[in-house]
Amino acid sequence: MCRWFRRKKQGQPQLTPAPVPNGEDYWNSKYPKTVVVYEGRELPNTGMIAVDVRDFFININDYQLQEVAQKLQGLSDDEKALECLRWVIANITYVADKTEYGLEEFWCYPNELLKTKKGDCDDGAILLANLMLAAGLPYWKVRLTAGAVPEGGHAYVTYYYEDGSRWVALDWCYFPNVDAVKDRPDYKNSPIYLEVWFSWNLKYAFCAGVKGEITLKKVRFL
């Protein structure tokens, strides 16, 4: 039967619109939900600490986040997303974990990065996603994404464009594009973002083909 309509058992056929892939339930169910535990924080004399990646979303009412987010009131979701990206690009300096902490990998929480103002790709991406939620964007439209780019592992934000047509990349350091959201292509069609390893929002994590819990060892992010 054509997927665009369902025929009643009796009477004339009626056309029923197919589900439109632009809502919270659709996107939270499109891929298997996974608990991603990532060894992303290395501490001196302790070694790697495994953390549920969702824990990198903190309280959106955190006063440091709100100092930035309150300036974005009255803007559309797309405008808020872009202004959050521009703020991170303008206020955070890219510094490798090895240089800043003497560690191979150290994912910062947003309030830590707001204190130091220095970090690498994952740190800025985590801060950006938290700023977007603090500014009022729906949680399911904001995903932190970890995957491959031509030079190695990379973390960035993917955002669901307000018109419901595509997910776009918001990247503060590897490809710091400040073009309007409407002018950005679907990130999956980009020659820059080659492969997604896992992604997550405030509530759920996703890893293609994986259900249940998965523990990922340290990956060197840019």
Segments (PLM) and residue ranges:
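A structural boundary/capping signal
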Residues: 1-222
